[in-house]
Amino acid sequence: MYCTGDLKNRHRKLHVKSRIYLAGVLGLVSATAQAQSGDEVTVQSGRLAQKQFDAPASVRVIEGDAIRNAGVQVNLSEALAQVPGVVALNRNNYAQDVQISIRGFGSRSAFGLRGIRLITDGIPATTPDGQGQSSTVSLTSADRIEVLTGPLAQLYGNSAGGVIQTWTREAGEQPQLDLSTTFGSYGLRRHDVQFSGRTGSVGIVADYSTFEIDGYRKNSAAERKQFNGVLTSQLQPDTKLKLVANLFDMPMAQDPLGLTADQLKADPRQAGNRAELDRTRKSVQQNQLGAVLLHQFSPSLEMQWRLYGGTRSNLQYQAKTFFNPSSWVDLQRDYVGLGGQLKGKESNLKFGSMDWILGFDLDQSSERRNGGETSSGEKIATLSTSKVYRDELSKARNTDAFMQMNWHWVDAAGHNPFTITSGLRYSRVQLDSVNYNPASGDNGIGNLNSTAASPVLGVTWHTTDQLNLYANWGRGFETPTLAEAAYSVADSLNSVVPKFNQALTASKSQHSEIGAKWTPSSGQRLNASLFKISTENEIVTALSDSGKTAYVNAAQTLRQGAELGWNSMWSEHWKSLFSMAWLDATYDSKFDTKKTSGGVSVADKSIPAGNRMPGIPQRQMYASLQWAEQGFAPKALGFSASADWVSRSAMWASDMNDAVSRVAGYDVVNLRARHRSQWGTVRLEAWAGVDNLTNRQYVGSVIVNQSASTPQYFEPGLPRNWMTGIKLSVPL
């Protein structure tokens, strides 16, 4: 616990650390550099495409080969480990998905994504209220992943603590069939069939994959089937259409729940309290179709339209707790969205040129929520005996408009010393819930409406061809999701009940960042940034209990951090990656969670100012050394190998920062070996890997603010485990 004086001293020390770090970065990048052109990779910097080297933001790109080399291509956490500022924790619990946070946004999530926008092939994969599921991304057909952090992410609207965009690979000129199979520890099986080809102006990529695992822990088996198809057609020389179909079917994912510290120590492979008895599990099915139409009026003016829609069903069985019976929740969601944008370039301005974009997003989801009690893991469906207690219809919709301008200032000598970026997004988000079960009274009734203007401003100083310095600032907001508003803390202590949480409000945040991008020589690239984020009414976990989680608004939070990324190509055969992130995420002022006693609202627990936000390690490091016999080109043959190191510092699972919720830091080493060969036109690729080479025992993820009566915070990481696979590529 920190007193006011301690907190001031602590912040003063953080500011000193920031100055020292910045001085080191500027000293490093001011060293003599060899003449070298900047990074030519084009990324989405805010809403406008821009060279990665020139963008006034932290933008990282993971190419297709890196995605495939990272693991079995099942979880986004495999590839995202290398991105500074992104904490991707594998729960090894496929019922709840991986836990991903960007600069601390998303760490509160009990399942799926929160605080992060997910976009696949130009189609939003995040609902209007801010929910997303990373498991629906098809990694077996992914060509590229981009991660945008910092102020410019606010141009994507609600819950844009960061933006993750993925793209399916383009079809080649020659039809090709790819067959792959992967096996691993604990009964892991993944099989994939992919067809790609092009006929005239029409190209298609169709990918179907299956995944099964018996699970490391008891009650942790899972099964998935997934199809991802992208059809592109050049309708006219200046008009292109992309159709996207994504089908995701997870008929069964058992939920082992978390473990207490004593359970973790006794046997990390066991399931949590009553998980086996109540057969805790989840089934999910999602079908989505989308279309993106791009028309170019001229080389300097283009228009884009996007339309999508889909359905999602989610059936979950939850365990009995001390206060609540075992239960089930059935969610049936329909969603639809429309967006448009006009993008242009003005080249004949007096002082340079300008890129600009204007656009809008309209999205809506409708979710029918039913719930009731279970017996031995099966529904008790008798309404007259109050065994079915939820029948609600919840809707989320957003109406957004946005704009962005990049002004490339050119001086009298024809040089471009500065690029100034400005943007604004106006958002209106509405959440409504109505109740159709008279027995539950007004428990399912409520609404939350939020409006916000999110301005951003940034500048890049092109000091040399090898060095760019940038600074940016922005404001953002985040609404509660429908799932977060669906539960409240009960009148009694340590209990979560199915009641719409009318007390939740949207959080408001202010982001600032400075950074440097340096390419000292061919094959060397260094990115460094410092940032500060202040948030009011941050949405945090009040209480979590066996799959049911209630949330509350904290008064103020503060995030201060530094990120460093260094990519090096040492020779044709050797390269390395290194990233480091330091994040101090704290409650900047004291706040209380509430309960009701005798009809009066009283304090439940008091969180002191200075306590660290749970689920966020203060330090994270990643290093990878890679070797390739015949170089790193995507089609290079021969042997290749890599050794990766991931290190994370300690973190807390409770905002009380008590000893029982502290998780020790850890280091793990992963190895990969691969061989590619070719006979005629047929290519064969075989690979093998070992994760956690040293067999380190560690906690892979935490469930934030579990009930004090059953503090099942911990989800164990895997011990040493192996995987091996083979892929056959046959031109047709």
Name what the model sees in each region.
Residues Y21, G122, Q234, N246, ...:
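Conserved C-terminal beta-signal and adjacent last beta-strands/turns
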Residues S353, I357-T464:
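Signature of Gram-negative outer-membrane beta-barrel scaffolds
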